[in-house]
């Protein structure tokens, strides 16, 4: 259910702005999106898991705040990240 270290490293390498970048908004949003996708799959089989559902809502909220910050500070980076992750269909 959680992200493996290899998958997390791949996400960081794919979305990092420079080498060693693990904290930029792009990297954080990519990791959160992966965790949200994993939890969404979990809820397809465990519909009554309300404790995890609360965690999912917190993750979605955190991702929304990061995306809002990125949109305010650099709209071009925001647009490229949205397209790369496939958000806003």
From Swiss-Prot:
Keywords, A to Z, come to: Ribonucleoprotein, Ribosomal protein, RNA-binding, rRNA-binding
Q: Which GO terms describe its biological process?
A: translation
**Keyword Ribonucleoprotein included in the entry's annotation:** yes
A GO molecular-function descriptor? structural constituent of ribosome
Asked whether the UniProt record includes RNA-binding among its keywords, one would answer yes
Recorded GO cellular component terms are: cytosolic small ribosomal subunit
Quaternary structure and partners:
Part of the 30S ribosomal subunit. Forms a bridge to the 50S subunit in the 70S ribosome, contacting the 23S rRNA.
What family is this protein classified in?
A: Belongs to the universal ribosomal protein uS15 family.
Q: What does this protein do?
A: One of the primary rRNA binding proteins, it binds directly to 16S rRNA where it helps nucleate assembly of the platform of the 30S subunit by binding and bridging several RNA helices of the 16S rRNA. Forms an intersubunit bridge (bridge B4) with the 23S rRNA of the 50S subunit in the ribosome.
Designated name of the protein? Small ribosomal subunit protein uS15
